[in-house]
């Protein structure tokens, strides 16, 4: 996918809303044995990258260092007319950092009040001497809004056939 196409998809207001306000993504990657994994994980959107963080010793760190291609989805909506999703494919770069990455704390701030956040940050700083900062750079992006008719192409094609 071309950079301008990626930028276009990411700039759609609904995509921006999901990227900046949702607290969870589902990250897909290949495990060390070559089988797929999908995990829910908190994230932070920097404007250019999706950043997730975890313990430096987490199994996903070694798996992503070995195979950096990933996919993720950020979604919302409980009914078909409310269903929205940003699907991203890209490469993950893993950096082991001292302490707690700021993006990890920023992701938590989206869902915690000030008191809970202070306790969470203190607990994290006590627990983690190091963390893995995993930055995912999009190489393909699609925003879907089922209620607004922004559907995957195959569904658009099926819907078009039904209207003939």
PLM regions: where:
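Short, basic/aromatic recognition patches
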Residues: 2-26
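Structured helix-beta-strand junction loops
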Residues: 21-22, 66-67, 130
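Short beta-strand segments
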Residues: 23-56, 64, 71-75, 84-87
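A generic "binding-loop/recognition-motif" signal
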Residues: 56-57, 139
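Active-site-proximal loop/turn and secondary-structure-junction residues that shape catalytic pockets
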Residues: 78
């Amino acid at each position: 996918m071309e950079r301008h196409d990626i930028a276009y998809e990411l700039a759609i207001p609904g995509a921006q809303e999901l990227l900046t306000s949702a607290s969870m993504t589902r990250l897909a990657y290949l495990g060390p044995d070559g089988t797929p994994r999908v995990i829910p994980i908190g994230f932070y959107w920097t404007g250019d990258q999706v950043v997730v963080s975890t313990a430096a010793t987490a199994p996903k760190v070694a798996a992503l260092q070995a195979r950096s291609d990933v996919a993720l989805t950020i979604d919302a909506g409980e009914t078909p007319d409310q269903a929205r999703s940003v699907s991203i494919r890209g490469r993950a770069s893993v950096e082991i950092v001292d302490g707690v990455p700021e993006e990890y704390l920023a992701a938590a701030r989206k869902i915690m009040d000030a008191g809970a956040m202070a306790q969470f940050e203190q607990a994290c700083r006590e627990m983690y001497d190091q963390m893995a900062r995993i930055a995912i750079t999009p190489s393909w992006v699609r925003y879907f809004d089922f209620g607004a008719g922004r559907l995957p192409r195959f569904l658009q094609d099926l819907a078009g056939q039904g209207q003939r």
